[in-house]
Curated annotation (Swiss-Prot):
Domain of life: Eukaryota
Organism per entry: Caenorhabditis elegans
GO cellular component: membrane
Entry annotated with the keyword ATP-binding: no
Name of the protein described by the UniProt record: Serpentine receptor class delta-41
Length: 324
């Protein structure tokens, strides 16, 4: 079995590689979103950029702090091996919650994209109050989680006696610092863990349900729109559904090991070092799903790769008229 030192040596190389490749991917797709999104889809453009921003925050915080969740200790401790280990403990503890929030926020942005696409596909303008109600329900888990995390930061890391205790613990920081502990006897922690876990599981369920309804609607209206438009709509839906499954695929396996460690207090180094890194992997794959499954972006990539030979006039038409 790899030792703690083996994991550290690997992650010293992997963290910079992951940061650079993820940021390049995110900046690349943001360029496409800002420059090649049709004008009639500006709201979706903001949602897509929002998703990218949260994923950039997630990856950057992971690299800066390089957390290790020492699950076999009671109470459970969170250590930092990154440059952030030199910060005061409450800063690291706050960034720990930022990482968790970013995971939920980027997933909720995908759900918002699905809702806007569903609304556009039905071609029915919802009343303002009904639209606000749906958006509020979508955002409620995120707002609740952020509120609970603010409470935890204020109560678990900001009191002077706690700050002084961690200053003494980290007075001679070398390879890592202790940024905080996780106390699951605190109600706010319990509720927040439930929100985080249930949100990741619910995203694919919502996605599959929306997929079924969207494809049914596309099928019903297939005789009123072109075959090309139908294909574009189906392709977009497939891409968004795939994006809803990414957090589940990367979050659930490592979280299952995490909950096992909470119950048994067993030391599993892989879980401790990768608990925050693996859920950040969608930030690397998400941009390429967006580029492939959204028609205007895919067409532009093909033009750059000389897979599509079109005149300048045709390029303009693609940017203006292509839909998701």
């Amino acid at each position: 079995m790899p030792s703690s030192e083996d994991y550290r040596q690997f992650l010293e190389v992997f963290y910079p590689f992951f940061l650079i490749t993820s940021l390049i991917s995110q900046l690349f797709v943001i360029y496409f979103i800002l420059n090649y999104t049709p004008k009639q889809l500006q709201t979706l453009r903001y949602i897509l950029v929002n998703t990218c921003v949260f994923q950039v925050i997630h990856v950057s915080a992971c690299y800066l702090m390089q957390f290790r969740q020492v699950s076999n200790l009671v109470p459970m401790e969170v250590w930092s091996y990154g440059y952030g280990r030199h910060f005061e403990a409450f800063v690291g503890y706050s960034l720990y919650h930022v990482v968790q929030t970013s995971t939920v926020a980027s997933g909720i942005s995908v759900v918002m994209t699905l809702f806007l696409k569903y609304e556009a596909a039905r071609n029915v303008k919802l009343t303002s109050w009904k639209r606000y109600l749906i958006i509020t329900c979508i955002l409620l888990p995120l707002v609740t989680s952020v509120t609970l995390e603010i409470i935890l930061i204020i109560t678990q890391s900001l009191p002077n006696e706690i700050r002084e205790r961690y200053k003494l613990i980290n007075v001679d920081v070398k390879d890592h610092s202790v940024v905080g502990t996780l106390n699951f006897k605190v109600l706010a922690s319990q509720v927040n863990v439930c929100i985080m876990s249930s949100s990741v599981v619910m995203l694919p369920i919502i996605g599959l349900s929306s997929r079924r309804k969207l494809l049914e609607h596309i099928q019903k209206t297939s005789d009123r729109v072109s075959q090309t438009k139908n294909s574009q709509n189906k392709m977009f839906v497939k891409g968004v559904i795939l994006q809803t499954f990414l957090p589940l695929c990367f979050y659930c396996p490592i979280s299952s090991i995490y909950f096992y460690c909470i119950v048994t207090h067993e030391e599993i180094l892989f879980q401790q070092y990768f608990m925050f890194l693996i859920p950040a992997f969608p930030a690397l794959f998400d941009p390429y799903i967006t580029l492939y499954f959204i028609t205007p972006y895919r067409n532009r990539v093909k033009i750059w790769l000389r897979m599509n030979k079109v005149s300048p006039k045709s390029v303009t038409l693609i940017n203006v008229n292509c839909n998701y």
